[in-house]
């Protein structure tokens, strides 16, 4: 069964039910199924290789992704924000059989192309009946940041997501009565997953051409959103907008957060502005999909990313691959039916394999109750004064300080210590903490060798397209484009 396994059934049973809304356009299930079928017929006849989709965020991209999946072809979803040189390098590696682009490609679409006239724009004729694709065929290549600077293309088979759909039904109970708001870019796997998950369930999926808190709030109100997918920065901006307007979203029953740890100081505002929503955050990776889930009702220990997601088995291993007991820190390995197939852009040094278990280099430990605690990424580890330090631990503590909105701790070359710690900070509005105060704050919570002595304020906090802190961009600000705290 493919990720579009239930689309035709929903179209038959509930033809007039809304399936997809984006940018002022809404498709019913009958209309979506018919359009996907026509576009799938076009893609099935394309030259061998993947279907490259280099398009702005929107309904056209969503439909063409589903069409490639139904055709048994691999949708390679590029980020339209990439520089031209990076785009060219990625295309040279993934070599699509057909490229659909708003720039240059085999099929060129206008940047504003919607669903009206989409089939004609790609040269699709009438739909032809076709068998369901093999569940072990690849359907998707997404891209995530690579240690070399070139995005890594990871490949997934249908089965990895259909198994996820079934597992998260058990976790979250998403069904045909839900209205799913996924206001981020489809080049980010979280929001692409939300789209596919919603269509599989027969829900109404709300997308946005770009993330704007006001537009997200308006979509939620106008269509009665019940489920919100987001990364912490987006959810926080949405909450700030609701607070500024004196509004709430009482119709939301579930907020699903991923990409980074949700700040504890924001929980009260979330409960006030989304008063009927259960909050759950999950840890995962592009290669791993769901790994753990942390639900408010399950009394997750402070600092933990939760318990294993349904269908997932966790282990902690040392550098030699030996399994470690509870409480011991090592590399986090995951076994599940949700794992990716391989890298479409070649070998990655960040991937570790032990039997049927895979690790992307995250370090952590399991407590006696089976909750996972992440320490950091092995590739971000800093050696200072001969000791290994994971900067994520320091960042998490700094972000509990009321004056700090975001923190990034990096190592700067130091002839005596190996690397000197520098804490880069985005300060909360109107706040101006002194360096000595921050040192004292950290010394009461961390060992002395983990306490930075240098603090730099960053006026315009760099973010990746997916809303995460852009650490390489922050490193480039040192020392001339940041302001040292006195």
Give the residues covered by each predicted segment.
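AMP-binding/adenylate-forming catalytic domain of the ANL superfamily
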Residues: 447-468
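Conserved AMP-binding/adenylation subdomain of ANL enzymes
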Residues: 162-179, 187-227
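Conserved pre-ATP/AMP-binding loop-to-beta segment of ANL
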Residues: 3, 15, 125-143, 150, ...
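Gly/Ser/Thr-rich phosphate-binding loop
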Residues: 227-229, 241-301, 313
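AMP-binding/adenylate-forming catalytic core of the ANL superfamily
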Residues: 228, 336, 356, 363-450
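Conserved AMP-binding/adenylate-forming core of the ANL superfamily
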Residues: 8, 16-45, 56-58, 66, ...
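Conserved ATP/PPi-binding loop(s) of AMP-dependent carboxylate-activating enzymes
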Residues: 307-311, 322-352, 387-389
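Conserved AMP-binding A3 loop
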Residues: 28-30, 139-163
């Amino acid at each position: 069964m493919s990720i579009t396994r239930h689309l035709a059934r929903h179209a038959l049973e509930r033809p007039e039910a809304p399936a997809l809304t984006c940018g002022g356009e809404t498709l019913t299930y009958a209309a979506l199924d018919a359009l996907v079928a026509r576009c799938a017929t076009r893609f099935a006849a394309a030259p061998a290789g993947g279907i490259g989709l280099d398009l702005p965020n929107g309904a056209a991209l969503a439909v063409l992704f589903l069409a490639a999946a139904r055709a048994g072809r691999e949708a390679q979803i590029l980020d339209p924000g990439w520089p031209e040189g990076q785009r060219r390098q990625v295309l040279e590696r993934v070599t699509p059989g057909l490229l659909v682009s708003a720039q240059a490609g085999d099929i060129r679409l206008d940047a504003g192309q919607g669903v009206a006239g989409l089939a004609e724009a790609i040269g699709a004729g009438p739909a032809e009946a076709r068998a369901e694709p093999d569940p072990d065929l690849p359907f998707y290549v997404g891209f995530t940041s690579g240690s070399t600077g070139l995005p890594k293309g990871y490949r997934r088979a249908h089965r990895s997501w259909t198994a996820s759909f079934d597992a998260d039904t058990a976790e979250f109970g998403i069904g045909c009565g839900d209205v799913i708001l996924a206001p981020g870019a489809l080049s980010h796997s979280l929001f692409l997953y939300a789209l596919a998950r919603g269509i599989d369930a027969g829900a109404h999926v709300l997308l946005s051409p770009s993330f704007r808190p006001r537009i997200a709030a308006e979509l939620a109100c106008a269509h009665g959103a019940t489920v919100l997918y987001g990364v912490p920065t987006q959810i926080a901006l949405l909450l700030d907008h609701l607070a500024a307007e004196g509004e709430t979203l009482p119709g939301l029953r579930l907020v699903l957060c991923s990409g980074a740890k949700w700040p504890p100081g924001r929980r009260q505002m979330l409960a006030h502005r989304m008063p009927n929503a259960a909050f759950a955050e999950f840890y995962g990776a592009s290669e791993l999909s769901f790994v753990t889930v942390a639900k408010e009702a399950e009394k997750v220990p402070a600092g933990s990313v939760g318990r294993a997601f349904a269908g997932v088995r966790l282990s902690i291993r040392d550098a030699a691959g030996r399994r470690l007991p509870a409480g011991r820190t090592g590399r986090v390995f995951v076994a599940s039916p949700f794992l990716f197939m391989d890298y479409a852009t070649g070998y990655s040094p960040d991937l570790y394999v032990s039997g049927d278990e895979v690790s992307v280099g995250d370090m952590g430990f399991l407590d006696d109750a089976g909750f996972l605690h992440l320490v950091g990424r092995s590739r971000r580890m800093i050696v200072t004064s001969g000791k290994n330090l994971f900067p994520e631990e320091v960042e998490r503590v700094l972000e509990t300080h009321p004056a700090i909105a975001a923190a990034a701790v990096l190592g700067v070359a130091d002839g005596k210590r190996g690397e000197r710690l520098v804490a880069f900070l985005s300060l909360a509005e109107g706040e101006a903490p002194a360096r000595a105060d921050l040192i004292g704050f950290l010394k009461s919570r961390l060992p002395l060798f983990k306490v930075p002595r240098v603090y730099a304020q960053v006026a315009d906090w760099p973010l990746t397209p997916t809303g995460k802190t852009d650490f390489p961009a922050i490193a480039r600000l040192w020392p001339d484009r940041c302001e040292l705290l006195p």
